[in-house]
């Protein structure tokens, strides 16, 4: 059975939790290394999610470069 993809937001929350744990003074070197490795994996997943979103946007926009017009209110 296919695994459901995690959202970018849920990956970000996990990464923030890891960062907070690594910033604590109570974590061991081994724990820091484990968290660092997990953080790198999360960053790679997040990068992939962003790349997929960018590809979908390009398809929807017909690969046309358009200038963003924001709302300056």
From Swiss-Prot:
Annotated GO biological process: DNA catabolic process
Tree of life domain: Bacteria
GO molecular function: exodeoxyribonuclease VII activity
GO CC, one annotated term: exodeoxyribonuclease VII complex
Enzyme Commission numbers on file: 3.1.11.6
Record localization: Cytoplasm
Catalytic activity: Exonucleolytic cleavage in either 5'- to 3'- or 3'- to 5'-direction to yield nucleoside 5'-phosphates
Major place of residence: cytoplasm
Pfam families cross-referenced by the UniProt entry: Exonuc_VII_S
Keywords from the UniProt entry: Cytoplasm, Exonuclease, Hydrolase, Nuclease
Family: Belongs to the XseB family.
NCBIfam families according to UniProt: PRK00977.1-4, xseB
Stated role: Bidirectionally degrades single-stranded DNA into large acid-insoluble oligonucleotides, which are then degraded further into small acid-soluble oligonucleotides.
Quaternary structure and interacting proteins, as annotated: Heterooligomer composed of large and small subunits.
Protein name: Exodeoxyribonuclease 7 small subunit
Source species of the chain: Clostridium novyi (strain NT)
Gene behind this protein: xseB
């Amino acid at each position: 059975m296919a695994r459901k993809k995690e959202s970018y937001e849920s990956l970000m929350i996990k990464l923030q939790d890891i960062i907070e744990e690594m910033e604590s003074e109570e974590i061991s070197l081994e724990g820091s290394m484990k968290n660092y490795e997990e953080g790198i994996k999360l960053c790679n997943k997040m990068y992939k999610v962003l790349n997929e979103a960018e590809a979908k946007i390009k398809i929807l926009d017909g690969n046309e470069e358009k200038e963003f017009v924001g709302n300056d209110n």
